[in-house]
C-alpha cells in the first residue's frame, strides 16, 4: 500500500493526526542548529522560527509523525555504530543512497561532516519532501537536485533504478520499512540489493521501529497498517531474502538509544539498528 493510502486508511479508522503534532520548538538541538547556521547560513536568531515555519507548512499538507514531531531535525545517522565507516567510505568516493530520505536531513549531516555531495543520493516517494528539504536547508547550490530522486522503491522502472541500479556501495534506510507489510518488505530488500554493487562489502544500514509486545503489535496493525518488527521477524525477513536471491549476506543487529522511543505512544517500542553486508 502506498504511504499516502496508508495515511488515509489510518485517518478513516479514527486516527487523530493531532497526536503527531508537537508544540513549536523553542530551541533547535545540535547538530541541526550548527548545520543551519554554518551550512545553510540561517542567521542565529532566525534558526528556531525558520524550523517552525517549515514544519507548519509541511504538516498542513502531510500530517506524518516525522513532520509533526520535528523528527527531521533530530538526526540519527551519526548515532549508528556504522556512521564512521559510512562517512569515511563516502569521503573516499563510495556512493551512498538515503532511501526514504524525507527532507534529506541525514545527507546534510554527511555533507557537513565532509562528504562530497556528489557521492550522496537521496530518494523519497514524495517530491514535495525533497523540495521541503531545500526550503529547510537552503542549499540548492551545494546539493544538486540531480542527487535527489523522487521514486517508488517498488517500481523497478523508475528513475531510481534507471540511474542507480548496481551503482551504490551503501544504502541507508531509517524509519521507512514499517510502512510496508512483511511480504512487501522482502520485495523492498531485494530491490535494494539490486541498487548495490554486486561485490563484497556492499552494505545496507537500517534504523527500524521495533516492538517487543506482539499483542500491541497486532493491535497496531489492525488500526494502522504498519509492520513493526521484533528481532525474530527481522532475522526471518533477511533469511527469506537470502533464500529468494541466493545472495550471501551477513546480518548484525543491535538495540540503540533513540529519542523517538521516549515520545512514541505505543508501549514496548524500541529502535533496532542493523547492518546487512554482502559477502
From Swiss-Prot:
MF annotations from Gene Ontology: methyltransferase activity
Its pathway, per UniProt, is: Secondary metabolite biosynthesis; terpenoid biosynthesis
Q: Look up the EC number in the record and give it.
A: 2.1.3.-
Q: Which top EC class is given?
A: transferase
Q: What InterPro entries does this protein's entry cite?
A: Meroterpenoid_MTases, SAM-dependent_MTases_sf
- Function summary: Methyltransferase; part of the gene cluster A that mediates the biosynthesis of the fungal meroterpenoid acetoxydehydroaustin. The first step of the pathway is the synthesis of 3,5-dimethylorsellinic acid by the polyketide synthase ausA. 3,5-dimethylorsellinic acid is then prenylated by the polyprenyl transferase ausN. Further epoxidation by the FAD-dependent monooxygenase ausM and cyclization by the probable terpene cyclase ausL lead to the formation of protoaustinoid A.
Q: Which organism is it from?
A: Penicillium brasilianum
Q: What is this protein called?
A: Methyltransferase ausD
**Keywords, alphabetical:** Methyltransferase, S-adenosyl-L-methionine, Transferase
**Alphabetical list of PANTHER family matching this protein:** METHYLTRANSFERASE AUSD
Q: How does it assemble?
A: Homodimer.
Q: What does the entry list as the binding residues for S-adenosyl-L-methionine?
A: 124-125, 152-153
Which miscellaneous remark does the UniProt record hold? Answer: In A.calidoustus, the austinoid gene cluster lies on a contiguous DNA region, while clusters from E.nidulans and P.brasilianum are split in their respective genomes. Genetic rearrangements provoked variability among the clusters and E.nidulans produces the least number of austionoid derivatives with the end products austinol and dehydroaustinol, while P.brasilianum can produce until acetoxydehydroaustin, and A.calidoustus produces the highest number of identified derivatives.
Q: Which domain of life is it from?
A: Eukaryota
Q: A GO BP term, please?
A: methylation
Amino acid at each position: 500500500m502506498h504511504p499516502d493510502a496508508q495515511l488515509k486508511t489510518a485517518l478513516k479508522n479514527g486516527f487523530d493526526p493531532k497526536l503527531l503534532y508537537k508544540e513549536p520548538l523553542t530551541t533547535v538541538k545540535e547538530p541541526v542548529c550548527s548545520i543551519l547556521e554554518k551550512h545553510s547560513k540561517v542567521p542565529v536568531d532566525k534558526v528556531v522560527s525558520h524550523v517552525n515555519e517549515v514544519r507548519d507548512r509541511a504538516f498542513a499538507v502531510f500530517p506524518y509523525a516525522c513532520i509533526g514531531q520535528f523528527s527531521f531535525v533530530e538526526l540519527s545517522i551519526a548515532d549508528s555504530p556504522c556512521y564512521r565507516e559510512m562517512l569515511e567510505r563516502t569521503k573516499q568516493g563510495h556512493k551512498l543512497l538515503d532511501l526514504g530520505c524525507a527532507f534529506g536531513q541525514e545527507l546534510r549531516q554527511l555533507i557537513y561532516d565532509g562528504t562530497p555531495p556528489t557521492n550522496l543520493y537521496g530518494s523519497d516517494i514524495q517530491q514535495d519532501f525533497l523540495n521541503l528539504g531545500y526550503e529547510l536547508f537552503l542549499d540548492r547550490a551545494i546539493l544538486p537536485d540531480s542527487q535527489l530522486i523522487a521514486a517508488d522503491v517498488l517500481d523497478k522502472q523508475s528513475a531510481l533504478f534507471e540511474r542507480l541500479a548496481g551503482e551504490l556501495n551503501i544504502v541507508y534506510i531509517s524509519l521507512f520499512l514499517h510502512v510496508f507489510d512483511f511480504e512487501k518488505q522482502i520485495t523492498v530488500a531485494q530491490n535494494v540489493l539490486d541498487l548495490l554493487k554486486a561485490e563484497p562489502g556492499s552494505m545496507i544500514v537500517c534504523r527500524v521501529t521495533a516492538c517487543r509486545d506482539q499483542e500491541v503489535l497486532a493491535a497496531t496493525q489492525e488500526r494502522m497498517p504498519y509492520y513493526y518488527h521484533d528481532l525474530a521477524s527481522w532475522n526471518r525477513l533477511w533469511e527469506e531474502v537470502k533464500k529468494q536471491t541466493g545472495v550471501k549476506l551477513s546480518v548484525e543487529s543491535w538495540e540503540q538509544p533513540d529519542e523517538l522511543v521516549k515520545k512514541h505512544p505505543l508501549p514496548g517500542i524500541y529502535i533496532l539498528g542493523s547492518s546487512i553486508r554482502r559477502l
